């Protein structure tokens, strides 16, 4: 029964203005918490069907709710009900910063305790956002594309970070992922999920548990 209570949440679709673009977002808040911390979520590449409705984001959000943490997923420009044209990474970083700014002012969450999570293409955007704003207190990168991941890792991301990759990711040999992860400043946690490929099918609960525990400890 207690598990049932702890997993209850309220979902609300909201629109966020980003310049002349309107972004569609989904705010999910735990009903058992007052002004909880919140994790922003960046989705995979829409050219491969990515949006806020995704197995990795779903499992992460469910796990966070059980920990008393809200989530705010948003569709990048040109995706779902978000207006504009998808920018292939050129404008999505600024969309993320707009959403972070918006989240810091939402009454029902604690705007001083914001985290960010990104999956695949979205992980690159989350890393970019975390490198330029102190409003994000911790961040999670899941299956960031190798080429994008390799552009980070110097001192620019000072927040606690959890870096995750499957050992069967078609894009990223786990040995190279481990090597590149070592270039990130501490505090950092590196997790290679044995048996998981880029899509984490069948590994959602394990992933959600990693994400929930990390944000519970860092927000």
Task: Annotate each language-model stretch with its function.
Residues 3-15:
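A domain-start/cap signature at the N-terminus of enzymes
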Residues 16-109:
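Serine-hydrolase catalytic machinery in alpha/beta-hydrolase-like enzymes
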Residues 96-159:
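Primarily recognizes the serine-hydrolase "nucleophile elbow" in alpha/beta-hydrolase
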Residues 157-158, 163-165, 169:
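Short beta-strand/loop motif that positions the catalytic acidic residue
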Residues 167-172, 198-199:
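Acidic catalytic loop of the alpha/beta-hydrolase fold
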Residues 172-181:
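Short alpha-helix in the alpha/beta-hydrolase fold that links the catalytic acid
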Residues 183-199:
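Catalytic histidine neighborhood in serine/cysteine hydrolases
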Residues 201-214:
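Post-His helix in hydrolase/transferase enzymes
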């Amino acid at each position: 029964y207690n598990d049932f209570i702890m997993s209850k949440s309220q979902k609300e679709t909201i629109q966020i203005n980003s310049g002349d673009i309107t972004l569609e977002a989904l705010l999910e808040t735990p009903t058992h918490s007052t002004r909880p911390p919140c994790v922003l979520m960046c989705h995979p590449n829409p050219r491969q069907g990515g949006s806020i409705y995704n197995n990795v984001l779903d499992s992460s959000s469910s796990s966070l709710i059980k920990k008393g943490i809200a989530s705010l997923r948003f569709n990048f420009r040109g995706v779902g009900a978000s207006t504009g044209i998808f920018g292939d990474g050129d404008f999505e970083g600024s969309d993320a910063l707009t959403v972070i700014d918006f989240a810091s002012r939402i009454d029902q969450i604690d705007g001083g305790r914001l985290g960010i999570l990104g999956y695949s293409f979205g992980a690159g955007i989350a890393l970019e956002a975390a490198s330029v704003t102190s409003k994000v207190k911790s961040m999670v990168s899941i299956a960031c594309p190798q080429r994008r991941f390799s552009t980070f890792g110097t001192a620019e991301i000072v927040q606690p970070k959890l870096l995750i990759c499957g050992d069967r990711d078609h894009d990223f040999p786990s040995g190279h992922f481990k090597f590149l992860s070592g270039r990130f400043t501490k505090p950092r946690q590196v997790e290679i999920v044995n048996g998981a490929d880029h899509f984490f099918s069948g590994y959602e609960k394990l992933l959600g548990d990693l994400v929930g525990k990390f944000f519970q400890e860092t927000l």
